[in-house]
Swiss-Prot record:
<dbReference type="GO" id="GO:0005737">
    <property type="term" value="C:cytoplasm"/>
</dbReference>
<feature type="binding site">
    <location>
        <position position="273"/>
    </location>
    <ligand>
        <name>Zn(2+)</name>
    </ligand>
</feature>
<feature type="binding site">
    <location>
        <position position="280"/>
    </location>
    <ligand>
        <name>Zn(2+)</name>
    </ligand>
</feature>
<dbReference type="InterPro" id="IPR004881">
    <property type="entry name" value="Ribosome_biogen_GTPase_RsgA"/>
</dbReference>
<dbReference type="InterPro" id="IPR030378">
    <property type="entry name" value="G_CP_dom"/>
</dbReference>
<dbReference type="GO" id="GO:0042274">
    <property type="term" value="P:ribosomal small subunit biogenesis"/>
</dbReference>
<dbReference type="GO" id="GO:0005525">
    <property type="term" value="F:GTP binding"/>
</dbReference>
<keyword id="KW-0963">Cytoplasm</keyword>
<keyword id="KW-0378">Hydrolase</keyword>
<keyword id="KW-0342">GTP-binding</keyword>
<dbReference type="GO" id="GO:0019843">
    <property type="term" value="F:rRNA binding"/>
</dbReference>
<dbReference type="InterPro" id="IPR010914">
    <property type="entry name" value="RsgA_GTPase_dom"/>
</dbReference>
<comment type="subunit">
    <text>Monomer. Associates with 30S ribosomal subunit, binds 16S rRNA.</text>
</comment>
<keyword id="KW-0699">rRNA-binding</keyword>
<comment type="similarity">
    <text>Belongs to the TRAFAC class YlqF/YawG GTPase family. RsgA subfamily.</text>
</comment>
<dbReference type="GO" id="GO:0003924">
    <property type="term" value="F:GTPase activity"/>
</dbReference>
<feature type="binding site">
    <location>
        <begin position="138"/>
        <end position="141"/>
    </location>
    <ligand>
        <name>GTP</name>
    </ligand>
</feature>
Length: 321
């Protein structure tokens, strides 16, 4: 008679600690836990895990957000081994997070000052993921209601529906939490110093994440979050705080740049231009309206890609790859 197969449980990787993985179980049998207490039954169980060497042999890297199967479970020590990884539904490279369902781009209205170029870089990075993109304006209390309305109208012109929040007054936090509760895994990103960590501390009062100050000279925040970790917002909804950085990279393929700008929606779907590979600059027969605010930013990004393309080819040739 064959030996009984060792039990396996499904979970999600919520943090990486050196060579260990922290896995939050999706389902488990409380009666199997020797040290489990009913006082903690409101919190999902997390196990500290290593990983099977066969995953390395298969080249199966494991990252935060991955759905995994754990085995060889030691309930008393709350340890286990990750034996297998489920296929990913989505993937973000920077920071590395799997199975993201929404990206929340956080931008400050002030301190640091709103920078349209920098904001566009973060939004383009978010659009590349192919998941829902939400735009949040932080530090709403630092500007007047009229100034805020002007900024909201401006960003609606970019094709977004921004939400304004204030950690100091609590304004907008309830609406933001309701929005995030409908998504499985939301990643927060944005420049350092815009208040992502402070915002998460308000959304998740049980946390105590370190908060960094904003440097006065450059108006850039000192990085506070050093690693990616998932936190439970409510049943079925997780959020991730990610290391802040000030200048995300532009997309690798310039031909895909236009579709990452919502302002192009409806303009290029039916190919109004004479040439299907039109870059919407000065090409003959271009049918795209160029009167929108971020069009100069779009052109600058294309020029930057052109310079990078030439550099990668040793300075020879012209045009975009």
């Amino acid at each position: 008679m064959a030996a009984a197969e060792a039990p396996r449980l499904a979970g999600m990787v919520v943090a990486l600690q050196a060579n260990f993985l922290e896995v939050e179980l999706e389902t488990f049998n409380p009666s199997s836990l020797v040290s489990w207490r009913r006082s903690t039954d409101a919190e999902p169980l997390r196990l500290l895990c290593t990983r099977r060497t066969r995953l390395d042999h298969r080249g199966a890297a494991v990252h935060v957000g991955d759905r995994v199967w754990v085995e060889a479970i030691d309930w008393q020590e709350r340890r286990a081994v990750v034996g297998d990884v489920e296929p990913r539904q989505s993937w973000i490279n920077r920071p590395p997070v799997a199975n993201v369902t929404a990206v929340v781009v956080a931008l400050a209205v002030k301190q640091p000052c709103f920078d349209a170029d920098q904001a566009s870089r973060f939004l383009l990075s978010a659009e590349q993921t192919g998941v829902d993109v939400h735009l949040i304006l932080t530090k709403r209390d630092l500007i007047t209601s009229d100034q805020l309305e002007q900024q909201l109208v401006r960003l609606r012109g970019w094709g977004y529906r921004p939400m304004a929040v204030s950690v100091q007054t609590g304004e907008g936090l309830g609406a933001l939490k309701n929005k995030l509760s409908s998504t499985r895994l939301a990643v927060f990103c944005g420049p350092s110093g815009v208040g992502k960590t402070s915002l998460l501390n308000q959304l998740l009062p049980q946390l105590s994440l370190r908060v960094g100050a904003v440097s006065g000279r450059l108006q850039r925040g000192r990085h506070t979050t050093r690693h990616v970790e998932l936190f439970r917002l409510c049943e079925g909804s997780l959020v991730a705080d990610t290391p802040g950085f000030n200048r995300p990279e532009l997309p690798a393929d310039p031909r895909k740049l236009a579709v990452l700008f919502p302002e192009f929606d409806g303009q290029i779907e039916d190919y109004p231009c004479r040439f299907r590979d039109c870059f919407h600059r000065d090409e003959p027969g271009c049918g795209v309206d160029k009167s929108w605010e971020r069009y100069p930013i779009y052109k600058r990004f294309l020029e930057e890609m052109e310079c990078l393309s030439r550099s990668s080819r040793g300075g020879s040739g012209s045009g975009l790859l």
